[in-house]
Amino acid sequence: MAPMGIRLSPLGIAVFCLLGVGVIYHLYAGVLSSRLAFFRQKRTVDLRELLALSIDAAVQGGREVKRIREDNTLEEKSKGKTKEGASEKYTLGDLNSHRKMYYLIKNTFPNIQVNSEEHANAEGEATVWTRMIPEDILAKVSGGKEIPAEKITVWIDPLDATQEYTENLLKYVTTMVCVAVDGEPVIGVIHKPFTGYTVWGFVGEGSNVAPRDSYNTNSPKVIVSRSHAGKVKSFVQTAFGNNTEIIPAGGAGYKALALLNPTDDKQETADIYIHVTYIKKWDICAGDAILKSLGGQMTTLKGEQIDYSGLEGNKGGLLASMKVDHKALVKRLPLWEDNKQ
């Protein structure tokens, strides 16, 4: 007698396959929803996870910045005028990068405050962080640093150096994320979209970059904003002498990295970073955290620490240094009236 068997018709096979796909979909959807629910219920944040997330956000935003520049679809517009009267530009690169960065962070940790230079009216993206922590972070940063969400403020700059971005001066362009705890900069990430170079620092834990071996404060190289280079020249020369080399550059992130020993061969280097006019906190917080993680300083021109809670602006100018007597530098600076505006 021949063995009994089960034969499925083509219709039966199709129904069976559809049922299988349905089961897989519901299982996957359940994993995603449970992951989102986990983060929404959590009222504390692990800072090592937030560092890894910040790097991912900066890189994802950077991809948008690079793609739009390469496609030449900038859609350049103006927000208005800066306090100095210059046109404050924004592009599709700024907006798309903002969406990627802002919603990745907010979807992962909805209870933390996120301040961004840009504001998009479009619907948020359903982006979920993979929770993958890079090996270099696992090696250098210990876990378990849980901080109440209400103590945290995240500052993001989706595209630093927009003016230079529109001029195709791409070495100055960065995306940045900074994490402040009770107003103090703790984590900083600066990513260069056009070279793929990323720098991070975690105060008290370490960084993936190092300072240089020495810095010259007798006849220093001073990096300043290229849009204010003429205005700040006399200020710098009064402090450090007429032969002081002044390096005009775009982007606050780029200028902060100039004080370090980066492996990016397109990065200029300087001994001191000075800014004399009003500047937004999303421009400087990441650089401040990275410098502090390596023993450096970023203060107002009067030597005051910058509070990264509250209002978005810093009116006191900026002095940044590494491995030198920062207080002695402050004493050499002349009075600058514009920083009171």
UniProtKB/Swiss-Prot annotation:
Keywords: Hydrolase, Magnesium, Membrane, Metal-binding, Transmembrane, Transmembrane helix. The keyword Transmembrane helix applies. SUPFAM superfamilies: Carbohydrate phosphatase. Mg(2+) 1 binds at residues 117, 157, 159. GO terms for cellular component: endomembrane system; membrane. The gene is bpnt2. Belongs to the inositol monophosphatase superfamily. Mg(2+) 2 binds at residues 157, 160, 283. GO terms for molecular function: 3'-nucleotidase activity; inositol monophosphate phosphatase activity; metal ion binding. It is a single-pass membrane protein. The chain crosses the membrane at residues 11-31. Substrate binds at residues 117, 159-162, 283. Its cofactor is Mg(2+). It comes from Danio rerio. Pathway: Polyol metabolism; myo-inositol biosynthesis; myo-inositol from D-glucose 6-phosphate: step 2/2. GO terms for biological process: inositol biosynthetic process; phosphatidylinositol phosphate biosynthetic process. The keyword Hydrolase applies. Pfam families: Inositol_P. It catalyses: a myo-inositol phosphate + H2O = myo-inositol + phosphate. This is Inositol monophosphatase 3. Its EC number is 3.1.3.25. It is found in: Membrane. InterPro entries: CysQ/Inositol_MonoPase, Inositol_monophosphatase-like, Inositol_monophosphatase_CS.
